[in-house]
């Protein structure tokens, strides 16, 4: 079978990629990309998996689906391309990041430095039509991403950061005896004041990694993004 990702995720996800459900998803997406504006572009659908291999994944920050306006979606949850205004949820993430670990806010939203350190920035649904949040929900991506979450859980020593009810619906896939779950309300302006602010997910994540015998994440993002370092 053609390697879709190019690292150990291909083997981990092979049963899902070889399923009839995934073939139906591929046929659906082919039509969607030909007739609509879909984000991210097809070359960045699997960016999260490409940047953070199965073996290297220490942390999962789970999002719902990609940003649905032009230029935003990167293939990484919560991340936007350099030069794109920060979405409100990401602004709140940066505020909590500063309050929690003192990471200085940056004027871009490109989170690849986290991915390079073992933070899988995974959306549960990997594509979205322009202007239509959740437009591809239930079309088949959940088979792929649920398989990934379950495989990481079975391997163990992973910190799952789950913001909001949608992400927390994945808790039944996770073995809490082998892994750590950090949960709070979503960083969206609609819910951040209800317990996201002050939840200290970044320091709690690093505390858990150290207990697992893993190196902590350096959450400080670079002030500037080198174009050569973009995925």
Curated annotation (Swiss-Prot):
- EC main group: hydrolase
Q: Tell me, which GO biological process terms does this entry list? A: base-excision repair, AP site formation via deaminated base removal
The keyword DNA repair is annotated on this UniProt entry: yes
Where does it reside?
Cytoplasm
Q: Which domain of life is it from?
A: Bacteria
Query: Is Hydrolase among this UniProt entry's keywords?
Result: yes
Keyword set, alphabetical order: Cytoplasm, DNA damage, DNA repair, Hydrolase
Q: Name one GO molecular function term.
A: uracil DNA N-glycosylase activity
InterPro entries assigned to the protein according to its UniProt record, in alphabetical order: UDG_fam1, Ura-DNA_Glyclase_AS, Uracil-DNA_glycosylase-like, Uracil-DNA_glycosylase-like_sf
Q: Where is the active site?
A: 65
The record's Gene Ontology cellular component field reads: cytoplasm
SUPFAM superfamilies xrefs: Uracil-DNA glycosylase-like
NCBIfam families assigned = PRK05254.1-1, PRK05254.1-2, PRK05254.1-5, ung
Its function, per the record, reads: Excises uracil residues from the DNA which can arise as a result of misincorporation of dUMP residues by DNA polymerase or due to deamination of cytosine.
The family classification in the record reads: Belongs to the uracil-DNA glycosylase (UDG) superfamily. UNG family.
Q: What's the protein here called?
A: Uracil-DNA glycosylase
């Amino acid at each position: 079978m053609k390697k879709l990702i190019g690292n150990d995720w291909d083997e981990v996800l092979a049963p899902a990629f070889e399923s009839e459900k995934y073939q139906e998803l591929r046929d659906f997406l082919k039509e969607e990309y030909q007739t609509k504006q879909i984000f991210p572009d097809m070359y960045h659908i699997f960016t999260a998996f490409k940047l953070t291999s199965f073996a290297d994944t220490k942390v999962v920050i789970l999002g719902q689906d990609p940003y649905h306006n032009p230029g935003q979606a990167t293939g990484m949850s919560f991340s936007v391309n350099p030069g794109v205004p920060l979405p409100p949820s990401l602004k709140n993430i940066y505020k909590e990041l500063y309050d929690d670990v003192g990471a200085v806010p940056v004027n871009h939203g490109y989170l690849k430095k986290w991915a390079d350190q073992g933070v899988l920035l995974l959306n549960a649904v990997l594509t979205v039509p322009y202007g239509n949040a959740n437009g591809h929900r239930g079309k088949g991506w959940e088979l792929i991403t649920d398989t990934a979450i379950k495989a990481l859980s079975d391997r163990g020593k992973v910190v799952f950061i789950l913001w909001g009810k949608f992400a927390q619906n994945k808790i039944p896939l996770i073995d809490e005896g082998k892994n750590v779950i950090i949960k709070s309300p979503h960083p969206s302006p609609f819910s951040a004041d209800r317990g996201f602010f002050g939840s200290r997910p970044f320091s709690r994540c690093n505390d858990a990694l150290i207990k697992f015998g893993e190196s902590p994440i350096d959450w400080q993002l670079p002030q500037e993004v080198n174009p050569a370092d973009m995925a």
